[in-house]
Amino acid sequence: MAYNFLCETTTEPNWGKLNKLLKKYNQLESFPFLEATDEKFGLAISVPMKNVGGSAYKQFIHVNKLLTKNFKFTVYDMYYGKEVDKEHIKVIRREIT
């Protein structure tokens, strides 16, 4: 089991650079994918249940900022089906800490 996030962008990111940056977040797992039907580029982020806690939450906050600010991704919480924003981040904190 894991807590999952879907990240989407319409601009193809530099996957090599992104992968290098994400490697240091060892509490999270990620993998890229292409949504061929609507020409969006996607990234899945997971917090495995074995990693749930304050450290994983802090890492997710850093990754969320990295993805939204530097790579122009929109991040969605797959459990609730909502975009991760300033309000919803409080819900995520309760779920993964």
Predicted regions and their residues:
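Acidic (Asp/Glu-rich) sequence patches and key acidic residues
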Residues: 1-97
